[in-house]
Amino acid sequence: MNFLMSLSGGLLAGYLISGKDPFWTYSSGLAGIICASAGNDLYHPIQSMIIAMIGVVVAYKMHYWVERKFKIDDAVGAVAVHGYAGVAGLIICGFVLNGYPSSGYSVGAMWVGTDYAPINPLGMFIGAVIMFGVLGLIPGWIIAKVLHGMGKLRIPREVEIAGLDYNMLETSKQSEKAVSSATR
């Protein structure tokens, strides 16, 4: 139930905030699911829907802010859908589920005097930094630097100007000419 409510909340928010843009509407459904997934097993269905809507608004606004401010193009919106909505979902989960046990079983004596680790905003923020920064951004940046050093990160400038499919189109035109001249 929560999965479908977060999907519908994401679709609804994406449709409204993007001005009926189909790309953002469909992407926002996934962003809503990702945003609400941090606490979907503990949320009420209406909470899942509202949290998904908030996450979609954050992802949409952050996408265009980063694009304008830093001139970074996220052509398919993958960073917005997975990254911004995911971080927003983790932080929202920390506030909405503050004090809930993080697991259903005892893990020993914790620093707060209980035998389980409670969910809290700071812990969720630190988890977001570890997941997205340490396990995502830093390895991605290192791989991009290695690929750039090898000359494999971007296509050549002349191909970029002509268009990536130019060579394929020219090859297919030559093949068509060869076939048509052979049949005459």
Residue ranges and their predicted role:
Residues 1-184:
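Glycine- and aromatic-enriched membrane alpha-helices
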